[in-house]
Swiss-Prot record:
Organism: Cucumber mosaic virus (strain As) (CMV)
Origin: domain of life: Viruses
Main EC class the enzyme belongs to: transferase
Disulfide cysteine pairs (residue numbers): none
Reaction equation(s) it catalyzes: RNA(n) + a ribonucleoside 5'-triphosphate = RNA(n+1) + diphosphate
Subunit structure: Interacts with replication protein 1a.
Protein name: RNA-directed RNA polymerase 2a
Reported function: RNA-dependent RNA polymerase which replicates the viral genome composed of 3 RNA segments, RNA1, RNA2 and RNA3.
Bias kind Polar residues: ranges: 805-817
Biased composition (Basic and acidic residues): 772-785
């Protein structure tokens, strides 16, 4: 029974009766829609002729088409819900319907095509109208869901499986649909579907195998260990003393590592070029203009001034013992440089000199840090160290077996110095808190223009004896090699056989450089860096008993200089000459850097002792004040920063490879060094020449682009002319060409003195060889048996040989004076042809030996 629609009134409007369809009204509307749909299906094609007398029964719910008409079922879904019904649905229900009909592709949180409520409802309304409209094409129209998707994505409304290639598409834009125009359109947005994972048939962006966040945590960065393979294991002889000192974990095997050959894609051409004419005056003028205060520097009598002048110093807990000082052993002299570059003479470790060095290098420890919780914060810094630098998988899989082999290599190295296995002490019976102390005789050249007001102070060395160092050094060497193999690829420690400053495929140009200068690094290290390195050593795999043992006798130590008679106690500061100096300084610098700066913002990080250098695309962000307030370090950020580390500039060639170039200013200063000992055959000078050539092997790679880079970096660092740096390269090219050119830089006055004194101390004897006893002793003058300065022997009369003998004259007594007078007389009486063979003058006759006898004084 149908109820009449409610009348319009204020009461019906307020109670919600008016405007709401009753169930009977809804059923009536849907019945009319089904009737219209059935009529549309009947009108799809003309009905065949039938007898009028025959009645065709029809059912409103089950429609049967006549024979020959297409049998299609009327979709109830699109009839049941019209556009007005979708307007009443919620957004979640519309999203479900959109995903069911349009079937969008999900990429992360995005849908393609994107959902638009108005467009989706309009597509539904248009699809409903198209299905109800008379069909004018013989092509099969898509079903309701596909038709909605086609209208939403503006694609074809018909299926393509029944379409022939030669058929002419009908312009459906001519359909009589008011307000709409339809035309076939293919997607031309350039969208490409994402790749599908073969393992789980999911989009790779959604596949857990390709989750980038998971990959970042699970897959570690490439390390140095990926470039090195194990060649094999070699057995070595174990040593009982070493095993008893360092523990039973030592394995008597050797595990060598070799670097995998790097594929070379491009071979740089030969870049050797001729240079301009360089002379010694040009090099000296470069030194005078670049180092104005160095050209007049002369410290020949510096030691005399130190010992004779008044001296005052303020030190605490210093012990002086002046009773048994070791006297200085005089040396044989040194080569004198032609260039004056401000280099100093060797320093002698006297009491005053040692006290001055201790005052600067060991005493007056700065107190700049704040009070912190050492235990908690040291563990946090060590944890940050491993997260920033270490590949945990490589650390877990690396070995630690080369201790014994390194020990034997160390013993072979110092075997010539008298170190043997029998001399190894028992470390448990030694007091390891006592260190020997000395100063470096060679003073590091100064590049600042302060030599007119200041004199450089020599550095100090605090060390154990070789017998003690030989047992700890192999352990830390093996641990350092393991540490290097586990570093991430962008972390470089330029030391050892598996790392260097040569970086292939990395260009330093167009990068932000970052350099931290840490002053007073050794003596500023307190208990906090000490605890940090203890946690890091345990994390790297060093046996805990050895780590604790090593750290215990470094908490409080006593240094003593036996030559100067000076001793004083020290605490946590770094020992400059023990087995852990470089390794310890490097890990402390890396830990402090990782705590103050985020290492992920750098493309490359280089560390070496207290030196650090970073390269980044964007300006680095961090807090350098923590170096001072937290770690008690005097830190200075270098501005402007240049690629400079370990006294070397880093340059990039045209092939995108980076190589190191020694600082030209320091190399020029080394050309004027005063520490080369004198020798008869120039062996020490030749050793310095070979070292000079090895350091300057980069000259063959210096193109004009590299020279321009070096000039620019030189100007930025020293505020000096970059053109002079290019002139220095020309001088280096000349003096590395051959040894004769390098010898022009040095001379020795000792040879001149020997030449003058040789007239009174050397005698030339030419005599007939008679018997062995006569050759050994004649006229009371002993002949030097092992003298190698002999002239070639010649043949005299009778086929006998004559030889030239050089012997030392008697220094004292009347006989020496008499022999000198006789020699002077005979040297005037005997002519030169009597000394030389007559064959030298073109005569072949034999001269009697008696005419050539006697002694000739030169």
């Amino acid at each position: 029974m149908a109820f009449p629609a409610p009348a319009f009134s204020l009461a019906n409007l307020l109670n919600g009766s008016y405007g709401v369809d009753t169930p009977e009204e809804v059923e009536r509307v849907r019945s009319e829609q089904r009737d219209e749909a059935a009529a549309a299906c009947r009108n799809y094609r003309p009905l065949p002729a039938v007898d009028v007398s025959e009645s065709v029964p029809e059912d409103a719910h089950s429609l049967r088409t006549p024979d020959g008409a297409p049998s299609e079922e009327v979709s109830v879904e699109f009839v049941t819900y019209g556009a007005e019904d979708y307007l009443e649905k919620s957004d979640d229900e519309l999203l479900v319907a959109f995903e069911t009909m349009v079937k969008p592709m999900r990429i992360g949180q995005l849908w393609c095509p994107a959902f638009n409520k108005c467009s989706f409802i309009s597509s539904i309304a248009m699809a409903r109208a198209l299905l109800l409209a008379p069909r004018t094409s013989h092509r099969t129209m898509k079903c309701f869901e596909d038709l909605v998707a086609a209208i939403y994505t503006k694609s074809d409304f018909y299926y393509d499986d029944e379409c022939e290639a030669d058929d002419v598409q009908i312009d459906i834009s001519s359909r009589d649909v008011p307000g709409y125009s339809f035309e076939p359109w293919s997607r031309t947005s350039g969208f490409e579907p994402p790749p599908i994972c073969e393992a789980c048939d999911m989009i790779m962006y959604q596949c857990p195998c390709f989750d980038f966040n998971a990959l970042k945590k699970s897959c570690a960065e490439r390390t140095f260990a990926d470039d090195y393979v194990i060649e094999g294991l070699d057995g070595v002889v174990n040593n009982a003393t070493l095993s008893s000192n360092l523990g039973p974990f030592l394995v008597p095997v050797k595990c060598p590592y070799e670097k995998c050959p790097t594929p070379v894609g491009e071979i740089p051409p030969d870049l050797n070029r001729a240079t301009d004419r360089v002379d010694i005056n040009l090099v000296q003028s470069i030194c005078d203009s670049t180092l104005p205060t160095h050209s007049n520097y002369d410290d020949s009598f510096h030691q005399v001034f130190v010992e004779s002048a008044d001296y005052s110093i303020d030190l605490d807990h210093v012990r002086l013992r002046q009773s048994d000082l070791i006297a200085k052993i005089p040396d044989s002299g040194h080569m004198i440089p032609v260039l004056n570059t401000g280099s100093g003479h060797k320093r002698v470790g006297t009491t005053k000199e040692v006290l001055t060095a201790i005052k600067k290098r060991n005493a007056d420890v700065p107190e700049l840090g704040d009070s912190v919780n050492l235990s908690r914060l040291s563990k946090a810094v060590a944890e940050r160290f491993f997260i920033s630098y270490i590949n945990g998988n490589s650390l877990a899989s690396s070995n630690f077996v080369n201790v014994v082999s390194n020990f034997h290599d160390y013993m072979e190295k110092w075997k010539s110095s008298g170190l043997s296995y029998d001399d190894l002490p028992d470390l448990h019976a030694e007091n390891l808190q006592f260190y020997d102390h000395m100063i470096k005789s060679d003073v590091k050249p100064v590049v600042s223009d302060t030599l007119n007001i200041d004199r450089p102070v020599p550095a100090t060395i605090t060390y154990h004896k070789k017998g003690i160092t030989s047992q700890f050094s192999p352990l830390f060497t093996a641990l350092f090699e393991r540490f290097q193999r586990c570093l991430r690829e962008r972390i470089i420690l330029p030391v050892g056989k598996i790392s260097s400053l040569e970086m292939a495929g990395f260009d330093v140009k167009n990068k932000h450089c970052f350099e931290i200068d840490l002053s007073k690094f050794d003596k500023s290290q307190g208990e906090f860096p000490f605890k940090i390195q203890e946690h890091i050593l345990n994390g790297l795999g060093c046996p805990a008993p050895i780590t604790k043992w090593w750290c215990d006798f470094h908490r409080f130590s006593y240094i003593r200089d036996r030559r100067a008679g000076v001793g004083m106690p020290i605490s946590f500061q770094r020992r400059t000459g023990d087995a852990f100096t470089y390794f310890g300084n490097t890990i402390v610098t890396m830990a402090e850097f990782a705590w103050c700066y985020d290492t992920d913002q750098f493309e490359k990080l280089l560390f070496s002792g207290d030196d650090s250098l970073g390269f980044s695309v964007l300006p680095p962000v961090g807090d350098p004040s923590k170096f001072t307030t937290l770690f008690n370090m005097e830190a200075k950020v270098m501005e402007p920063a240049v690629p400079y580390i370990c006294s070397k500039f880093l340059l990039s060639d045209e092939f995108g490879n980076t190589f190191s170039v020694p600082d030209p200013l320091r190399e020029v200063q080394r050309l004027g060094t005063k520490k080369i000992p004198c020798s008869d055959n120039d062996e020490f000078l030749f050793a310095h020449f070979m070292s000079f050539v090895d350091r300057l092997k980069f000259l063959d790679r210096m193109t004009q682009s590299c020279i321009d880079q070096l000039s620019l970096f030189f100007e930025l660092k020293y505020r000096k002319s970059g053109e002079e740096a290019a002139l220095m390269l020309g001088a280096f090219k000349k003096y590395t060409a051959n040894f004769q050119s390098y010898k022009e830089l040095y001379y020795s006055d000792r040879r001149q003195c020997e030449l003058i004194n040789s007239f009174s101390c050397v005698e030339l004897r030419i005599e007939r060889s008679s018997s062995t006893k006569q050759r050994e002793k004649k006229d009371g003058i002993e002949r030097r048996r092992n003298d190698k300065r002999r002239t070639p022997t010649g043949s005299y009369g009778g086929g006998e040989e004559a030889e030239t003998k050089v012997s030392q004259a008697e220094s004292t007594g009347t006989r020496s004076q008499k022999s000198q007078r006789e020699g002077a007389f005979k040297s005037q009486a005997v002519p030169l042809p009597t000394i030389l063979s007559s064959r030298w003058f073109g005569t072949d006759r034999d001269v009697p030996p008696c005419e050539h006898g006697g002694i000739v004084r030169v």
